[in-house]
């Protein structure tokens, strides 16, 4: 199982030399499992860049794109890549999206409402490829060889966290996770998703000082991510969903601070995600 990151920012994209090393695109990563179609996780602006890569692959093979995506929630920074995903505009292409059903309407209703005039020039029905949606709640299912566990996690609006297992390896993904005010309590669903995984990709958007002013904004601190990882017996922690205001230097400082925490000693590796990073989890 191999994981490649195409977007690691939260809230909105950013650009400029001060953000170059970590990258400015919003949440999108791709899991490659030998013999399976690509498994995309979140559909932020990084999806456009992945579309460029995938277009070259499918054109070399002479076959249309078939892929599956896991969508945590419907905030703009997690869906903005959809209309700019090049392969989805090719005849015969198919993208199946598993994501949270909504209190009023379906996942399909919500996505179609977000991609239509006047906010986008065409309706999603006019894409030449096919986008299939599957509403998901607290359930387990399979995508190819991957076993997927989906559970609701605290955030603003209906939001899922995912655990993916394949090739005897496991990862948990919680890009948007509201830390509790005490920053110690861990919800049972979160522990279930994270328990003993090889890699935890976790929201680390705020510093402790920022969290003091934004405790109800739906996100975590790097310190809380370390706490979750240590309590769940995670092997490796990767901080993600970086705040768009945090420069490369600031993200380095946040990471160094996280690594100095006493609980970090219980984790094999604590790092921060960056665009174009690829992690090979191998096979058990």
Give the predicted meaning of each segment.
Residues 1-172, 191, 248-284:
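Binuclear metal-dependent hydrolase catalytic cores
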Residues 41, 72, 174-175, 202-204, ...:
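Active-site flanking residues adjacent to catalytic metal/cofactor-binding acidic residues
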Residues 181-269, 273-274:
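Cap/insert and terminal regions of metallo-dependent hydrolase folds
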